[in-house]
């Protein structure tokens, strides 16, 4: 009589999750040196097998062009030899970061003589659901391995060939370094059914992190039974206060909007105090025009745009709620700082908001009242980034309040546990 394995009745996604859970248990106690050796092996393998990766990526790019995909999306999808080498360099940067696992968060000797320590431990199995950029495959795997986690990767169908090749290289390197290869897996299947199954793998997958557009994130948050860390969209604001330095305000505005408009920390709305609007807006509109930005203006901004060279269209309600990720920005004049805050509270995604002001009182009030992951004073919204904050690489930028908020580095990929050490202590 043939004895069936429990795996025989499982779907491929569930099997992968069980393998990841077993791998996570093996990873958790490993010392930093062994994890770093695996990461160095990954970096070397990426460089050695660059041609294999680029060839696989070319299939995705060709398919995207045939489907009429925009050049902006194709650029994010494309891997060149230079980009693969840059990804390998990023992995080596992760090696240099401190290992958070085992860090004592707090500890003390209790009055009864018990030694109590709270220490960082891996989350376990991390699922990443993401869109077109295949570099996320390697970034996520490197950060999860460094923090002692197994990772289940579900990229978009548009990058299937690229992700398959990358994960093959990653698994070979990890296994060759003596770590469990199942610590890095691509979720089987290209259909949405595999995504739904991953989202319902509670008990096997410890956390899901979606990275992508608003629709993807909303779907994961609403449908997942696995706990989710929401890396929200970036409807970021720049508020120019009545007491702003105008030269500084123009520089911050243009950098926030136009340096790299397709990322989540670019500014999507400009708010200008009415007392400075007549002096500031003509300059700002011309600068935005020079940067190629279209302005979606309220009626008060439109009044200052008549003699401007800017491309200006009338704003609708939808504009205040839009993450453009393009050379577009919404703009409004507000009566006061408090009205700016009210606008932000109504429309912001909770990512990053900036104030430009020379008034310490205004800056203090703005930072106290605005409830976003990052509030910048006289600085661009573009600084909300793990690398810019000195955290090294990041898994995403969380816009929720539980577990992690803001750029998520290695410590945010850990939880904690308490270690209680006694000498025959019993509770009476």
From Swiss-Prot:
What is this enzyme's catalytic activity, as reactions?
Answer: L-glutamate 5-semialdehyde + phosphate + NADP(+) = L-glutamyl 5-phosphate + NADPH + H(+)
Which Gene3D superfamilies does the record cross-reference, listed alphabetically?
Aldehyde Dehydrogenase, Chain A, domain 1, Aldehyde Dehydrogenase, Chain A, domain 2
- Per its record, what are the GO molecular function terms? glutamate-5-semialdehyde dehydrogenase activity; NADP binding
What EC number(s) would the UniProt record show? Answer: 1.2.1.41
Q: Which domain of life is it from?
A: Bacteria
Any single GO BP term: L-proline biosynthetic process
Extract the Pfam families matched here. Answer: Aldedh
Q: What does this protein do?
A: Catalyzes the NADPH-dependent reduction of L-glutamate 5-phosphate into L-glutamate 5-semialdehyde and phosphate. The product spontaneously undergoes cyclization to form 1-pyrroline-5-carboxylate.
Query: Which family does the record assign?
Result: Belongs to the gamma-glutamyl phosphate reductase family.
Protein name per the record? Gamma-glutamyl phosphate reductase
Q: Which organism is it from?
A: Streptomyces avermitilis (strain ATCC 31267 / DSM 46492 / JCM 5070 / NBRC 14893 / NCIMB 12804 / NRRL 8165 / MA-4680)
């Amino acid at each position: 009589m043939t004895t069936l394995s429990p795996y025989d009745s499982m779907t491929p996604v569930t099997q992968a999750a069980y393998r990841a859970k077993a791998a996570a248990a093996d990873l958790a106690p490993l010392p930093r040196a062994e994890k770093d050796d695996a990461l160095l092996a990954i970096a070397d393998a990426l460089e050695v097998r660059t041609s294999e990766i680029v060839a696989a990526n070319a299939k995705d790019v060709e398919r995207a062009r045939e489907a009429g995909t925009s050049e902006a999306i194709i650029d994010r999808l494309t891997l060149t030899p230079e980009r693969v080498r840059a990804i390998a360099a990023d992995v080596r940067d992760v090696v240099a970061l401190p290992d958070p696992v085992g860090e004592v968060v707090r500890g003390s000797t209790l009055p009864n003589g018990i030694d109590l320590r709270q220490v960082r431990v891996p989350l376990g199995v991390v699922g990443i659901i993401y869109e077109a950029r295949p570099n996320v495959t390697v970034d996520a795997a490197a950060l999860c391995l460094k923090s002692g986690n197994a990772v289940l990767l579900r990229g978009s169908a548009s990058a299937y060939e690229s992700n398959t090749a990358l994960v093959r290289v990653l698994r070979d390197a990890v296994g060759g370094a003596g770590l469990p290869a199942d610590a890095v897996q691509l979720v089987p299947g290209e259909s949405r059914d595999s995504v739904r199954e991953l989202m319902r793998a509670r008990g096997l997958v410890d956390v899901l992190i979606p990275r992508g557009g608003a629709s993807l994130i909303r779907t994961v948050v609403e449908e997942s039974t696995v706990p989710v860390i929401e890396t929200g969209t970036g409807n970021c604001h720049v508020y120019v206060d009545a007491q702003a330095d105008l030269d500084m305000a123009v520089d911050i505005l243009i950098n926030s909007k136009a340096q790299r408009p397709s990322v989540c920390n670019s500014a999507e709305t400009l708010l200008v105090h009415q007392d400075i609007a007549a002096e500031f807006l003509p300059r700002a509109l011309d600068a935005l025009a020079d940067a190629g930005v279209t302005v979606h203006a309220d009626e008060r901004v439109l009044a200052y745009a008549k003699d401007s060279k800017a491309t200006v269209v009338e704003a609708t309600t939808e504009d205040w709620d839009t993450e453009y990720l393009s050379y577009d920005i919404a703009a409004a004049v507000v009566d006061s700082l408090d009205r700016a805050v009210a606008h932000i509270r109504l429309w912001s995604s909770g990512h990053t908001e900036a104030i430009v002001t020379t008034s310490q009182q205004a800056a203090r009030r703005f930072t106290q009242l605005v409830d976003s992951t990052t509030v910048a004073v006289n600085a661009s919204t573009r600084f909300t980034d793990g690398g810019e904050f000195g955290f090294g690489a990041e898994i995403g930028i969380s816009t929720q309040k539980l577990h992690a908020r803001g750029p998520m580095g290695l410590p945010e990929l850990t939880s904690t546990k308490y270690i209680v050490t006694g000498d025959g202590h019993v509770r009476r």
